[in-house]
Amino acid sequence: MMRYPEHADPVITLTAGPVNAYPEVLRGLGRTVLYDYDPAFQLLYEKVVDKAQKAMRLSNKPVILHGEPVLGLEAAAASLISPDDVVLNLASGVYGKGFGYWAKRYSPHLLEIEVPYNEAIDPQAVADMLKAHPEITVVSVCHHDTPSGTINPIDAIGALVSAHGAYLIVDAVSSFGGMKTHPEDCKADIYVTGPNKCLGAPPGLTMMGVSERAWAKMKANPLAPRASMLSIVDWENAWSRDKPFPFTPSVSEINGLDVALDLYLNEGPEAVWARHALTAKAMRAGVTAMGLSVWAASDSIASPTTTAVRTPDGVDEKALRQAARARYGVVFSSGRGETLGKLTRIGHMGPTAQPIYAIAALTALGGAMNAAGRKLAIGKGIEAALAVIDADA
């Protein structure tokens, strides 16, 4: 049965990103495209940076780079890491592992702690590595690795790195805005996120917190990109209406970010985090009651923004997702890299971080499993999810 053919738009997108954008954000994207040196746009840009600073709870101005957050992550490696740095990369998933490849490009001295991709980094292992290698100068970690649906204890890790005197790079692309995390909470020197996950805006921008000592290190690094898309230092003062932009900013994306930040701040960050957490909790309860299992090794490290569901033996994961889309109009994400074919990722970020979407996801997932010959107790899954939701009412 193909009620929703591939060429037709899906009914609901429940992926790990890009995610559905809020309708208000989409309307914001449709605002007039202003000349970037028009005083009205320069004032808007300054206000958007101020809103980002408030949302990120920073004591200094954040940086906005004009490309989706992978640009920001690579820029962080290129700008902060110099050839004499010793980098410790913490890998608990595909994206954490991937940052190590960038780090290796800019310094030959790479150490790594890697754990199975359904587990989290143990702060004690970080402490032991820092003690064994006092020469470590930079540590990198992915907070939420979406291909695993797991989160790392970055506040504890950050405290250890700070005490050691090393610089900390944090990938918070799919965690910021969906749970309590801020650059200064985890003592990050470069903290990379974006609007295209939990803030419910399209991909196209990077938001970055940069510590004062990271600014100093990047400026002193002769190999840090300048006059380049990968440059961070070129954008240091771009927030000020009195300073020129290094190149044309993404005007429409700034319009969208302006609205996304207003929505986040007006709803209240704690309220936003709470609905992400409730949706994820309902999702996990339903998955388990239905007879499936969550990929994360324990509930304590399971993400509140993406639930990774283990694919049962004998089930074709790609066919499963295709069935969910064709039969129910619901789109899920696959795994990536080592987790490809082993799990299905169900995103609940931004506008879809609402408990009712857990019910929709369980229905589509269970129905697709049944179509694959795995008869699941869909009703029990929905009942379990509703019990979680109703208990919070």
Swiss-Prot record:
Pfam families: Aminotran_5. Keywords: Aminotransferase, Chloride, Pyridoxal phosphate, Transferase. Pyridoxal 5'-phosphate binds at residues 68, 95, 146, 345. The keyword Oxidoreductase does not apply. One of its GO terms (biological process) is glycine biosynthetic process, by transamination of glyoxylate. GO terms for molecular function: alanine-glyoxylate transaminase activity; L-serine-pyruvate transaminase activity; pyridoxal phosphate binding; pyridoxamine-pyruvate transaminase activity; transaminase activity. Changing residue 336 to A: Strongly decreased affinity for pyruvate. Its EC number is 2.6.1.30. It catalyses: pyridoxamine + pyruvate = pyridoxal + L-alanine. Changing residue 197 to L: Loss of function. The keyword Transferase applies. The modification N6-(pyridoxal phosphate)lysine is found at residue 197. Catalyzes a reversible transamination reaction between pyridoxamine and pyruvate to form pyridoxal and L-alanine. Belongs to the class-V pyridoxal-phosphate-dependent aminotransferase family. Homotetramer. NCBIfam families: PyrdoxPyrvTramin. PANTHER family: ALANINE--GLYOXYLATE AMINOTRANSFERASE 1 (PTHR21152:SF24), AMINOTRANSFERASE CLASS V (PTHR21152). This is Pyridoxamine--pyruvate transaminase. It comes from Mesorhizobium japonicum (strain LMG 29417 / CECT 9101 / MAFF 303099). The gene is ppaT.
